[in-house]
Structure formats: C-alpha cells, structure tokens
C-alpha cells in the first residue's frame, strides 16, 4: 500500500475514533441529571496557586495527564504563564464518580482572573457558579485580593469552601491561616482543607467537599432558553467564540439566538464543551458552562454579562441581572517607536483589541511623536499586559505616554464632560469654558501589610492624598488598611512604592469609589515657549512645584546642545513654575584671526551675538524621538 493511502487510512481511523469518543462523552452527559451538576470557581490572591490547583483537579478527574507539558492548562495566553496571573476567564468540564454512591457528577471549573483590573470578568464568572474554593497560601495568609474577591463572591450568594494551599513549604503556618479564615471571613476552621497543589497532597479531599457543600444549578431544560455570556475570544478562522452559562433551556447547532443587549440575531454554527479544549456536541443544556460559535464577526458585539435567548421564543423574557459595559479607567497615548511602522502597528493593535473588547482604541496625532493611538484600559496591569502581548506576539516596539485617568468637567449649565487626554484639559482659559467644577476619580484601596510597616504605609498613603477609612488587625501581625485614594495616584506606581516600603510583603486591591471635587490643573512642558503635547500632564495643584522641577531637570538630560540658549519650562495656567536653561553651544569664530586684529575680532563676536539673538527668536528646536522615548521610559 502506498504511503498516501496509508496516511489516508490512518486519518480516517483517527476521525472515527474521535467521533466515537465525542459520542461517548455526549451519552455520558445525557445520563447525568442537573442535580448532579456542580459549577464552581477558585477565589485567590495572585500567586497563591490557583492555576496549579486547577491542573491537579483536571488530573484527578482524568481530563489531562500528569506532567510538565500540562502546566497551567487553563492559562492560554503566554503573558498569563509568564506572569503567573490569569487574565481571561476560562473553563473546563470534568466527570467524577463518587466512590461510595457510584453516582456520576458533571463539574464545571470556571477559572477567573484574580486581579482587580479584570473585575468584570470575575463577577460574570461567579454569576455562573454555585460556589467557590477560597484558596489561601499557608505561608502568606489572607491577602488583599483574597478579601476583595471573597466579599464579591459572598455578595453574589456563593457557597465558599476554604482551602489552605502550599502546606509543603517550610514557611507554611496552617494554624495561622485557619485563624485568619475564622476571624476575617467567619468561616469555621473545621471546614478548611489543607492541601499542596504542587505535590498533589490531599487534593482528593476537595471534590467530595464540592459535591457535598456547593448547590447544583436550579435551571430547567423545559424552560425557554436563557444563556449568560461569561467571556469571549476571537478565532481567526471561525470568528467570535463565546463562553456561556446555560441558565435555562437547550442550545443546539443551527438555532437562532437573540442578544438582549443589542437585539442582534445570530446562527449557532457550533456548540460544545471545553474538555479542556473545544469538543463539539449536538447540544448543551441548562446548568452547563459551554462554548458556542454564533457566526459573530465583530467581537465588540459580545458584551460580558449579556443574555441570549432563542429567537422567536423570547417574548416576555427578562434579561439576567448584572450586565454592565466595561469602563476604561486608565488612558495612555501609544506611538510606534519607528514612525514608518504606523500602518503595520495599526493592524497589530486592531487584532489585539479583537480579543479584548474592554480596550478602547482611537487614533490621535502628536506634534512630538506623530501618528498614534489613545488607548483606554481597565487599570495599569491591564495596560502593561496589553503592551507585553503586543511585543511578544508581534515583536512591536511601542512608546507609551504617562498614564492618565478620566477627569470630569461639570459646566455651569449642568452638562458634564469626560476628558481622557491631558492635552485637551482646560488650561489658563478655565473660566472661559463656563466650567463650574473639576472632579477626579477615587478608589477604595484595600491593603494587607505586616504591622511593623504600618507607620511607613500610612505616610505613603497620606503623601498620595489618601484618606484613612478603616484599620483592622488580623491575626499574627497582619494589618488590613483601607484608604480612599485618587486613582491618578494609584496608577503612578503606587503598588511599586508600597512593595518597596514593606520589603515586598504588602498586597493591594481596590474598587471604584466614584468622583470627587478636586483642585486639578494642567501642566505643560515647554521648550523655548513651545508646548510638548506628548509630555502634558494633569495633576493636583499641591504637586505642581515638585513635579515641575523634576520634569524640567530630567528633560534637560535628553536635549542636545544648540547654537543658542534653550529654555525648558514647566507651565501651569501660562505661569512658569519651574525652569532649566541649556546654555548655547560656543563656536569660536575668532580662531583663524591674528591676535593683533582686535577690531575684526570685536566685529565677528558682535555679529555672532546678534545671530544668536535672531536664532533664539526664530529658530526651532529639533528634538529627536529618542529624547521623548528616554524621558517617557524613565517616567514609566
């Protein structure tokens, strides 16, 4: 038999084996009643072992084989694996047979992001679950994100099972972690399950606890279809893939769906479960967390928290609660390091935005840096992850301006306006705009720190215009601090400073606290009177003198000498608040003259002096992009 025929036979055999396997999985699901479904999530602080625990559960239920090749299975993005964080919500179905009753259960693990920037994805993931594992590092104890995510899960009615992880470490303090669970969350210490996700120790105790304590979904296959959109991503071959929680009814291939938010219709091209990758099914039913391919080409139509109905059977149905559009809170200007690569970079940007509908993208032009974009993100980590993905996946080099936050202008006639670009913020003509009030966004920052650093951290918060709201002593030397802080201060590497003054032992989480009236102004960096738009910043008036001095001193380092004097000024409302001067580069016009030719020497020096005056009045400073790049990189 020829090699081609052999290969064709093998392909056919693999295809038949795959079809047979999928059919057996479908038959297995069909036999499991909805009362034996369990949908759960894992609540954890960054780096407490959530993705590793997910891997162990998938191994225990036979979804994946043990081994290094299957590390962090649910973290699909390179940046997720590198940073050890989860950015996109993922899911996986698992089968489990109770060794005593011999009953089979269908488990859906929804792996959620832990960081505050991705709170919308976290809350929608929780909405598809009946309970969650509250994961705590035995060596670090309860941290800020554990507390914040606990309250979010608790407020949504989830049943929480405390799991103490990393008990294999020498620094593990299991009694302390149990005490913190009892005092901070008011959960019985007897409910705590001590495990090591790394070694697999005691992992087998988790699933029986999930089956016993977490309630099954309450939906019905006989009711009209209602499905909650948990997450989505863009596939270059099939378009948008949506991760859904089927609350009621059944979703089948070929069914017409209707979005409650946009009222657009879609045809289901494919439906299936994640096991751990996409596995097509004939249908998915109430209680399941599954994927569908709806023939959607524009990912921005897939809004997290949206409800989908079956078209034609949607009359009188109410959408599921909790829908909210993502709201960018941090904005940056982005420019290609090489201006000639704008078109190519624009394609890369648009491709990345396809997979992240929470990023806003608008083209903008800078006098200093040329063509670029104004990008809106959920937070600073979100911006950093986006930049890393751009560099890792496309090899793109990009310049980011200093992050800014959305400021609110309240006009005398009651109208409101949001400003996200510092260059568009009102300056000296503030009153001419009929502006009644300026407001900036605040956040409630939640920090856990060792008590020995409490004085240092409180000083840091107060220096960043923070207002203390709460102070609570946890067990064994840990303190929980709550401060109200302007978001603008938080995005300026507040977390880096917090880590620095606590030797890395602090943790931080925050939530939106709305807008407050503030004395904020626009500071422009001018070179010989010309404002440099890429370097314009908005700040509180109390920071103007120190920031102004810092900026002009630093920018002076990156400017080349000119043949005439150059003034670098920081201006607020057309008033100079700081200045540095680059002295004129001296050119010896008398070097060829005889020492005795005094009148000729005077004439040449006088002409040079007049020429420098004229150059200063009419000459333009040539500032190369490297100067801007170096300044912004250091500012970043």
Curated annotation (Swiss-Prot):
It catalyses: GTP + H2O = GDP + phosphate + H(+). The keyword Cell wall biogenesis/degradation does not apply. Keywords: GTP-binding, Hydrolase, Membrane, Mitochondrion, Mitochondrion inner membrane, Nucleotide-binding, Protein biosynthesis. It is a peripheral membrane protein. One of its GO terms (molecular function) is GTPase activity. Its EC number is 3.6.5.-. Its main location: mitochondrion. The keyword Transport does not apply. Residues 35-218 form the tr-type G domain. GTP binds at residues 44-51, 111-115, 165-168. It holds the Pfam family GTP_EFTU. It comes from the Eukaryota. SUPFAM superfamilies: EF-G C-terminal domain-like, P-loop containing nucleoside triphosphate hydrolases, Translation proteins. InterPro entries: EF-4, EFG_III/V, EFG_V-like, EFTu-like_2, G_TR_CS, LepA_C_sf, LepA_CTD, LepA_IV. It is found in: Mitochondrion inner membrane. GO terms for cellular component: mitochondrial inner membrane; mitochondrial matrix. PROSITE patterns: G_TR_1 (PS00301), G_TR_2 (PS51722). One of its GO terms (biological process) is positive regulation of translation. Promotes mitochondrial protein synthesis. May act as a fidelity factor of the translation reaction, by catalyzing a one-codon backward translocation of tRNAs on improperly translocated ribosomes. Binds to mitochondrial ribosomes in a GTP-dependent manner. This protein may be expected to contain an N-terminal transit peptide but none has been predicted. Belongs to the TRAFAC class translation factor GTPase superfamily. Classic translation factor GTPase family. LepA subfamily. This is Translation factor GUF1, mitochondrial. It comes from Debaryomyces hansenii (strain ATCC 36239 / CBS 767 / BCRC 21394 / JCM 1990 / NBRC 0083 / IGC 2968) (Yeast).
């Amino acid at each position: 038999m020829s090699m081609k025929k052999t290969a064709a036979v093998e392909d056919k055999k693999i295809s038949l084996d795959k079809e047979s396997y999928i059919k057996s999985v479908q038959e297995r699901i069909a036999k499991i009643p909805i009362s034996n479904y369990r949908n759960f999530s894992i609540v954890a602080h960054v780096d407490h072992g959530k993705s590793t625990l997910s891997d162990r559960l998938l191994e225990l239920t036979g979804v994946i084989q043990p081994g290094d090749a299957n590390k962090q299975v649910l973290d699909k993005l390179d940046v997720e694996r590198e940073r050890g964080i989860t950015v996109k919500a993922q899911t996986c179905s698992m089968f489990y047979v109770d060794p005593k009753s011999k009953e089979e259960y269908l488990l859906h693990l929804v792996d959620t992001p832990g960081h505050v920037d991705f709170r919308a994805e976290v809350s929608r993931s929780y909405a598809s679950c009946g309970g969650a594992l509250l994961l705590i590092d035995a060596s670090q104890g309860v941290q800020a994100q554990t507390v914040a995510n606990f309250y979010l899960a608790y407020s949504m009615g989830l049943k929480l099972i405390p799991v103490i992880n990393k008990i294999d470490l020498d620094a593990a303090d299991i009694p302390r972690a149990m005490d913190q669970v009892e005092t901070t969350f008011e959960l019985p210490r007897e409910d705590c399950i001590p495990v090591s996700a790394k070694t697999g120790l005691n992992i087998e105790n988790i699933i029986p606890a999930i089956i016993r304590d977490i309630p099954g979904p309450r939906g019905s296959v006989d009711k009209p279809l209602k499905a909650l959109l948990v997450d989505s991503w863009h596939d270059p071959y099939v378009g948008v893939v949506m991760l859904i929680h089927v609350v009621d009814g059944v979703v089948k291939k070929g069914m017409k769906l209707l979005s409650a938010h946009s009222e657009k219709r879609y045809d289901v091209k494919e439906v299936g479960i994640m096991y751990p990758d996409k596995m097509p099914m004939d249908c998915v039913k109430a209680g399941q967390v599954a994927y569908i391919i709806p023939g959607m080409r524009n990912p921005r139509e897939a809004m997290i928290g949206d409800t989908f109905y079956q078209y034609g059977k949607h009359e009188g149905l109410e959408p599921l609660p909790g829908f909210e559009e993502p709201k960018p809170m941090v904005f940056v200007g982005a420019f290609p390091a090489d201006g000639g690569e704008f078109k190519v970079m624009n394609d890369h940007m648009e491709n990345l935005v396809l997979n992240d509908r929470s990023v806003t993208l608008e083209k903008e032009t800078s006098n200093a840096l040329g063509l670029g974009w104004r990008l809106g993100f959920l937070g600073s980590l979100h911006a950093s992850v986006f930049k890393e993905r751009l560099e890792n996946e496309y090899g793109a080099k990009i310049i980011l301006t200093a992050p800014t936050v959305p400021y609110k202008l309240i006009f005398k006639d009651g109208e409101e306006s949001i400003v996200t670009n510092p260059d568009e913020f009102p300056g000296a003509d503030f009153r001419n705009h009929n502006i009644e009030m300026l407001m900036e966004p605040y956040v409630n920052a939640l920090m856990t720190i060792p008590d020995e650093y409490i004085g240092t951290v409180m000083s840091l918060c107060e220096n960043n215009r923070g207002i203390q709201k709460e102070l609570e002593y946890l067990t064994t030397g840990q303190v929980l601090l709550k401060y109200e802080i302007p978001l603008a201060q938080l995005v300026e590497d507040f977390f880096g400073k917090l880590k620095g003054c606590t030797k890395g032992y602090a943790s931080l989480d925050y939530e939106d606290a709305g807008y407050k009236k503030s004395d904020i102004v626009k500071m422009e960096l001018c070179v010989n009177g010309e404002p440099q738009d890429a370097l314009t910043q908005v700040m509180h008036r109390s920071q103007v003198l120190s920031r102004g001095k810092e900026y002009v001193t630093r920018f002076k380092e990156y400017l080349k000498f000119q043949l005439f004097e150059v003034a670098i000024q920081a201006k607020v409302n057309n008033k100079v608040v700081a200045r540095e001067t680059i002295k004129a580069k001296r050119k010896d016009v008398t070097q060829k003259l005889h020492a005795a030719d005094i009148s000729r020497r005077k004439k040449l020096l006088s002409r040079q002096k007049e020429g420098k005056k004229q150059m200063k009045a009419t000459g333009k400073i040539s500032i190369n992009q490297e100067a801007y790049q170096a300044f912004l990189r250091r500012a970043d």
